[in-house]
Amino acid sequence: MTATRRVSRPGPVRWMFYLGAVVAIAWLATQAFYFAQIAVWNYVNPRTTSFMRSDAWRLSQDRPDLSVQHTWVPYDQISRNLKRAIIASEDANFVNNNGYETDAILQAWERNKAKGKIVRGGSTITQQLARNLFLSREKSYIRKGQELIITWMLETLMDKERIFEIYLNSVEWGNGVYGAEAAAHYYFKTSASKLTAAQSARLAVMLPQPKYFDEHRGSPYLAQRSRVIARRMGAAELPD
């Protein structure tokens, strides 16, 4: 009589190993996709971003009469006033940093810890671009970690001028308004190349809360902060 061989089934530990391997492979594949996409964008302009796609879907559901406004313009066709204003407002050390500002990150960490939730990110221009291109508006430490990884990829594969060019053409400036050209037309009926210092300062101040300031254009804070940024613009160092 032939003995029947008993086939052992994978135990919980082995299943956990399999699951961990699948998760690790998926994570690595995602990072490889981001890396390859950024490499391509050195030569090809992004047609859309994660934020744009999210807004397009939201508008199709809530405001079908509206659509995303976005027109790409080359770096040299964007006013130096706007470039200086954004650097003065968002990331004064943009040209010289490596995509991170350690002091700002630590300050944000302390504030978030005190509040018990993420209320501030301490983001540089490159970090903002990483988030806009690939991530969601959700605030979590996992998303922040991914943002830092993508920031490293951007700084590794692109020079500062290319990072800033993509940022200027993809950053959100209102309800469905993306990029300097669309913002210039939307708020001032002009082109990105013709923005004045005062207009540029105002647009720069809107960036942390573009939808709010789109609806509250008469905000005293917006007017006061714009004057401050206008005074700082002359000291802003550009990457070109």
From Swiss-Prot:
Pfam families: Transgly. Peptidoglycan polymerase that catalyzes glycan chain elongation from lipid-linked precursors. GO terms for cellular component: peptidoglycan-based cell wall; plasma membrane. Its main location: membrane. Keywords: Cell inner membrane, Cell membrane, Cell shape, Cell wall biogenesis/degradation, Glycosyltransferase, Membrane, Peptidoglycan synthesis, Transferase, Transmembrane, Transmembrane helix. PANTHER family: BIOSYNTHETIC PEPTIDOGLYCAN TRANSGLYCOSYLASE, MONOFUNCTIONAL BIOSYNTHETIC PEPTIDOGLYCAN TRANSGLYCOSYLASE. This is Biosynthetic peptidoglycan transglycosylase. It comes from Paraburkholderia xenovorans (strain LB400). It is an enzyme of class 2 (transferase).
